[in-house]
Amino acid sequence: DLVRSRGLGDVYKRQVNDQWMYHTRLYAAANYVKTRDDLDLIQLNSFGCGLDAVTTDEVYEILTRSGKIYTCLKIDEVNNLGAARIRVRSLLAALRAHDRKQAVREILPSSIQKPVFTKEMRKDYTILCPQMSPFHFSLLQAAFNSCGYNLEVLPNDNKHAVDVGLKYVNNDACYPSLIVVGQIMDALLSGKYDLNKTAVVMSQTGGGCRASNYIAFIRRALKKAGMEQIPVISVNLSGLESNPGFKLTLPLVKKVAYGAVFGDILM
């Protein structure tokens, strides 16, 4: 709160969608701490909140990219804090060892370079879309393809996709995020697609749900797998992101709306 109230650590390009003031304070504090040799940060959170999966990943990236040690303590509603004390003592020991090395830190940005989906890419790129509703999404695929896109709805919404998602997504995140990211990564790792001619599309509401940060989950997974060159297209109506090669035109919106209605009827 002190860092945020004094405007410290504010100039920071985030990977994630900043949804709550709680997030804003954490990111501002981490961004300030990474610039100081006399400060370190311990993040405290509770068990079971999917939003914490977003913040822990982002704070970790901010600190570790600049050579700081990241520590997160999960504290449930219990009186015994013995485990937390052990973690703090371990952090202090690690800091002392780090100081003895006298390593010179380089302060780096933690944001991921976001490839843009251009008009030229629209001609020959395959756009992968995770399967979230078998009735609706088969119709949405036809709607997009009739408007000049080469969109493919993935058929791999199964347990294997979840297992792949567990490798690339913070395991405190919700189940839908695991299967969405898992489908995408499973497809990209299959060897079926040219990774230099493939993009990914995902909706982004911009609201309070962690689904607003599925885009960030996908980009982080692509980075872990060495596929940063793949554009991730955000489908949103609030101007969160834009791509010159992907536009929600009136004919496309009408076809998508028809597809949603017919999907409801068929279901």
PLM regions: where:
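Single conserved hydrophobic/aromatic residue that forms the stacking wall/gate
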Residues: D1-Y12
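Generic long, charged, amphipathic alpha-helical segments
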Residues: D10-L26
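Extended, charge-rich low-complexity interaction segments
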Residues: A28-G48, D99-K114, V181-S190, L195, ...
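Internal gly/pro-rich beta-alpha loop/helix module
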Residues: I233-M267
